[in-house]
Amino acid sequence: MAKEKFERSKPHVNIGTIGHVDHGKTTLTAAITKYFGDFKAYDQIDGAPEEKARGITISTAHVEYETDSRHYAHVDCPGHADYVKNMITGAAQMDGAILVVNAADGPMPQTREHILLGRQVGIPFMVVYMNKVDQVDDEELLELVEMEIRELLSSYDYPGDDIPIIRGSALHAMNGTEPSMGEESIRALMAAVDEYIPTPARAVDQPFLMPIEDVFSISGRGTVVTGRVERGVINVGDSIEIVGIRDTKTTTCTGVEMFRKLLDRGEAGDNIGALLRGIDREGVERGQVLCKPGSVTPHTKFEAEAYILTKEEGGRHTPFFANYRPQFYFRTTDVTGTVTLAEGTEMVMPGDNVGFTVELIAPIAMEDGLRFAIREGGRTVGAGVVSKIIE
């Protein structure tokens, strides 16, 4: 059987289901594939394989489906810990999420935690599926639960009043029964996702950024830095900045090479060498980034949301305390930093997810949403994401 060709004609969006345990995330995922993709049964999704991201093992199920206007890649995680790890490592980047809430229970602790995490790690949009409405006879109760969900979303800076909330039963949709709360609710949900979650800007349309992996000096030509273009486009003749670790420098790209061939441009996804005018071999190093002037600034102090590995995952065997000083691995390099814990937090145990403040000994080109690994002597002991830059 030949592999199906991936049709690039429709815009592509990454989404996922989030919410409290047993509220129906996986059943809903299966139901969506029934009407919009190749049907995946519940246990095909629930038995998600383990994968590694930034040294952390995560179980995640990936399904894909499409509506008339878009192609979707959708992630669903079997366990709460997998969600936390997934959202923090960005293993499955989400452009938007479907928050699943059981109408009979209303918002529960993990509902709140997933919304908070979504806010911290930069999931920009959410749509709500109020599941199991067949178990609630009282219309007023449904109204109350809906109000509660909207208030909860608003309390985490999501536009609670505007977010679409679709009522239905994922189980009826799966079984093909009670179409008014089954199939119709799934179609209404995907219509809402199509309309409410915007298509993200493609990587090539964003401002240029390339983490520097290596530096070479070519006699008679100057200094070449190599790396993989993370986003945007670089053209020969462009003015660019070198940001991070040292003072920011501005230079001009005088050449772009790929596989030892000269090109006039490099774009997102390309592994290139960029020739820099007037920069000597000692003037630039791994861990800095090349970027469009003014697009990214260097910072040393930030708030972060992190997951600390368990002993079984290869992490620390003991907790850490305030003023913990590990290395923070950003893009291509380690920088030492000091951790300040939130008031009232005495220590952090392996397996915790936690918010804290970090001060690095050298500045790094940084934006909200940037991912990092926490390392001790080259061994990964955690993963995190910048939730807010302080200075």
UniProtKB/Swiss-Prot annotation:
Mg(2+) binds at T26. It comes from the Bacteria. GTP binds at residues 19-26, 76-80, 131-134. It holds the Pfam family GTP_EFTU_D3. It is found in: Cytoplasm. GTP hydrolase that promotes the GTP-dependent binding of aminoacyl-tRNA to the A-site of ribosomes during protein biosynthesis. This is Elongation factor Tu. The gene is tuf1.
